[in-house]
Amino acid sequence: MMRPVVVKEKRVNESHIHAVEDEVRQAKTMDRDIVKHAMKQSVAKLNPKVMIKNPIMFVVEIGFVITFILSFFPSHSSSIPGWFNITVSLILLFTVLFANFAEALAEGRGKAQADSLKQSKKDVFANVVKENGEIVQVSATDLRKDDVVIVKQGEMIPSDGEVIKGLASVDESAITGESAPVIKEAGGDFCSVTGGTMVVSDEITIVITSNPGESFIDKMISLVEGAARQKTPNEIALNTVLTSLTLIFLIVVVTLPIFTNYLGFQIDTAVLVALLVCLIPTTIGGLLSAIGIAGMDRVTKFNVLAMSGKAVEAAGDINTIILDKTGTITFGNRMAHTLLPVGNETIEQVGKWAAISSVLDETPEGRSVIEHVQAKSISYNKELAEQGEFIPFKAETRMSGVDLQDGTKVRKGAVGSVIEWVKSQGGTIPKDVNQKADFISKEGGTPLVVAVDNRIYGLIYLKDTVKPGMRERFEQLRQMGIKTVMCTGDNPLTAATIAKEAGVDEFVAECKPEDKIAVIKAEQDKGKLVAMTGDGTNDAPALAQADVGLAMNSGTTAAKEAANMIDLDSNPTKIIEVVGIGKQLLMTRGALTTFSIANDIAKYFAIIPAMFTLAIPQMEALNIMKLTSPLSAILSALLFNAVIIPLLIPLAMKGIAYKPMSSNALLGRNLLIYGLGGVIVPFIGIKVIDIIVGLFI
C-alpha cells in the first residue's frame, strides 16, 4: 500500500529538483550573456570620448598608444629591445580593458534588470471615463495625468494612479516579486497603484498621476540602466583626489629625464610610461565606477529603488534613524499577550473559554488567542466550538463568540459591551474587572473581557507585540554609532514600555506627523544625518526633510514623490538593511582605495631600482625582492598592476564583508586588512610573476 505513495512523492521531488535545475541553468545563461556583453563593451569603451570621463585610465590608454607606436618606430638612442615595447603596450591595453570590463559588467547587471522590467510594460488598453460618463477604450500610451480609468478583474493597470472608487486585490509581483496580492482601496494610505500590475479581484476606478515616460516603471528602468545615474559628491571628491595624484605623478615622470640627463644617463620612454602607470592609482581608478553602480545594484536586489547614488551614500553616513512604532517596531496588529483571571477564577478557565470563543474567529486577534492558549498548554474542547453557531464581531455589539449546542453562550469583547451583556443575563460583575482593564489600558494594551452566560471569567490582554529580533537589530545599530528614535501616538507610559522592550535609544510619545519634522530638524541641527520611513501623505514633509527618506510602495503618491528611496516590499524595517548597504558601499570604496595606494609601495621597490641600478649601483640596495633583472622587474610590476583589477572585480561588485561595529573599530580593521594587505600582496605577487617572467627573458 505504501509503494505508490513513495513513488508519487519521489516524482514530486524529482519535478521540484528539475525546476530548480532549470532556474540555475537560466541564471547561468544570463550570467554568461552579461559577461559576453561586458567583454564587447570593454572594447567599445576604448573610444577616447568615453575614456576621458575616467582621467586615470585615460592616461593609461595614452601610455598604450605611445608604447605601441614605439614598438614600430623605436628611438635611435633606445637601449631597450623591440619586444619590450610591444609587451608593455599589450599589458597597458589589457589594463584598460580590465577596467572597462569591470564597469561594463556592473552596467550589464543593471541592463538585465531593466530588460525584465520592460517585459512588464506590455501594450495594454485603458477604459477611460469621459466627462459625460461615456467609457472609451484607448491605448495606455495615450493616457495623460488626471485621466479617470476603470480597471476590472483580470485587467492590467495601464499607468500609475490613485484609487478614487472601489476596492480590489492587486497582483504586484511584476514590480515587487511578491506573489501575494495586496488590497488597494480609495482613501487612506493604500490607494496608490502602479502601472504594469494586475487587478485579480473586484473593480476599481483610478485617476492617472503620471504622463507617458514619467511612470514608476519608466523611472526604475532609467535608474537601473544607469541613464539617470550621476556621480555622488563623495565619488566626485575621491575622483578629484585620484586625478590630482595622477597629475602630480605625471609632472614627476615628465620632468624626470631632465634630472637623469644631468646625472649622465637616459631613461627610455617605455620605462617612463611603465613608471607612471605603476605610480598612479590604477586599481581604484579602474574599479571606482563599478563600485558605485554595484552599490545601486545591491539596493535594487533588496527590492529598494534608490532615486540616486547620493541617497545610497547618505544611508551609509546616517547617524539617526526615526522609526514609527506601529508596523515597524511592532507588528501593527493586536496579539494576545496575557490572560488575567478575575474574582476566584483561574488562568486555565479563562484560557479554556477564550479559546472556545475564538475557534471560529478568523481575525488576527482570534488566531493569536488560540496560539497563546496553546503555548500555555491549556486544554479546551475544539469540537464543542466547531459544532456551535459563530457570532461574528459587529460594530454595534463590539463582541464576538459562539453559541454552543447545549445553549451555553460564550462571548469576548470590549469591556463595557460584555459587562452590559452579562448584566442583561442577570449576572454580577467582579470588583476587579475594571481595575484590571484600566491596568491593561495604561500599559498601552487593549482589554477583552471573556464571559460565559452571566459569569465573567477574566480578561485577555491584547498587545501590539514587538517584532522578534528588534532588540538585537537596534543593538547592532548602536554598535555602528547610530541612534534610534521611536515615534508613536501612544501615551508616555506605553511608549516608554515599548521603547524599553524594543531597545530603542529614545522615543517621542503622543507624536503627530508634524512633530516628526521637528525631531528630524533637531537632529540635523546637531550635525546629524537622519533617515526615516513613511507611507502616508502626512509623512511626505518629513520624508522630504530627512537625508534618507524611505517610502513604502503601498503608500500614497505624495509620500513616494517626497522620498529619495522606495521600498517595493513596503517593509519599514528595511531601512536598517539600506543603512547597512550604504555603509558597505562606502567601506568598499575606502578599502579598495587604501589597497590601491598601499600597492604603490611594493611597486616602488620593484621599478625604481630597475630604472636606476645601472647608473647608480647603490640603488641595488632597494632591490629587496631580489628581482631577476631590470626588464623583468618592470614587466612584473606592470603585469601585477593589470591582473589585480579583474581579481578585485568580485569584491567590488559584492562589497566587502560588513560587520556592525563603531567607526574607529571599522577603520582599524580595514587598515589592517586592506592597508597592510595592500603592501604584502604586491610583494608576493610581483615576486611570483618575476620568477615566471624570468624563465622567458
Swiss-Prot record:
- SUPFAM superfamilies, from UniProt? Calcium ATPase, transduction domain A, Calcium ATPase, transmembrane domain M, HAD-like
Q: Where does Mg(2+) bind?
A: D535, D539
Question: Which is one GO molecular function term here?
Answer: magnesium ion binding
Catalytic function, reaction form: K(+)(out) + ATP + H2O = K(+)(in) + ADP + phosphate + H(+)
**Mainly resides where?**
membrane
Q: Which UniProt keywords apply?
A: ATP-binding, Cell membrane, Ion transport, Magnesium, Membrane, Metal-binding, Nucleotide-binding, Phosphoprotein, Potassium, Potassium transport, Translocase, Transmembrane, Transmembrane helix, Transport
Say which family it is in.
Belongs to the cation transport ATPase (P-type) (TC 3.A.3) family. Type IA subfamily.
Protein name (database record): Potassium-transporting ATPase ATP-binding subunit
Which species is the source of this protein? Bacillus cereus (strain AH820)
